[in-house]
Amino acid sequence: MKFLNRMMLIATMTLLTSLSLHAEVKNSNTTFAKDALTPFVQSGQLPGAICVFYKDGIQENTCVGYADVAAKRPITMNDVYMQCSQTKGFCGVTIAMLVEEGRISLDDPVSKYLPEFKTLWVKASEKDGVRTLVKAKNTLTIRMVMNHTGGFPFEISAKQGNIKGGGWSGGAPLRQTAAIAASSPLLFEPGTRVQYSNTGIDIGAAIVEVVTGQRWEIFLKERVLLPLGMTASSFRPTDEQLKTQVEMYDCVKDAPAKYRRQNNMQQRPYNDDHVFASAGAGLWTTANDQLKFYKMLMNLGMGENGVRILKEETVKNLLAKSSRPKGMGGYSLGLTAPEEDNENAWFGHGGAWGTFCMVNWHKKQLTLWAVQLCGQPRPWDAAREKAQKQFFQYVIDNSDVKAYTGRTK
């Protein structure tokens, strides 16, 4: 019966998506990003990139260069790529859903759902290979694991890049990741410092599994991806999808970028049995799909297709502003966010291979950047940022254009 109900929900969401009136997005007919980025593509330093600027229903889409330089395959908005840590925001949305529904509180102890976290130990010191541990005094909460103040390392031992089948998309499923983390010493007392951690976000996803009785990736698909029409996003892209993969490259100073077959933190084959859903970094997507998610955040929980994912107040209070104590930097639930929300505040996230998307819900602005690059330097960043400023100023100067507000009554 539960399975049948889920299938009916998916069917209903699909029907709503197909019947809803899509918001009109006008082409800006500008080339700010293309003009800024083309010289770097011509030099070979930038293999290929996707850049999107959006404000009030006016959008500039730019695809320059190649998804595969050797094959001379142009990069497109429908090519799949690994967004790495941008996956964290998707976990944040699923946590926010459960808070909105009254099923969890951000200040609930993690041990309420995962008993293995009842007693935790903190590494006090280490000398001559001997570690001294002390029992944790503070209660580890859901809020802490989602905003990187829980005290966990970046990745657990099973997900290190030097392990075959490891990396953030391999190593272990979510519940096993949580169990390993619970049995390992914390780096500091929970809630007292910041340590960027995929592990903490994976623990958050494991809590979603306990509360919902579903694998996290299934809950995400049914409650977020399918309702928004994000049909190209998954943790295991198909062989057919991978034919459109944006290939990975290493940045080289003053020289063309160098092809990289894989990074050890993202090991081939990308859809093999060693691949597990990682909430910290693991969701493949396309630029068109990613826009649907971030426009939903920009529109305070409402997808461009008219499907509501979260209430406005949920996005404002849980995602668009920091959930950390003051002075620890801005971060909410899997998303970079301002300590204090204001009309100039942006929230969103970036990923290890250079992707990012940020939104300003007050001004209905969005900027998306998609590349698959490792290392430095990245001399095009300044040029892209200048192009972004030019675009937003252009839209302000042409504000008489009928704009989509992002709201559906």
PLM region spans:
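Boundary at the C-terminal end of the N-terminal hydrophobic targeting segment
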Residues: 21-25
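Bacterial N-terminal signal peptides
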Residues: 9-18
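Short, well-ordered beta-strand elements
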Residues: 357-358, 364-377
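Short, surface-exposed loop or secondary-structure junction motifs
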Residues: 121-345
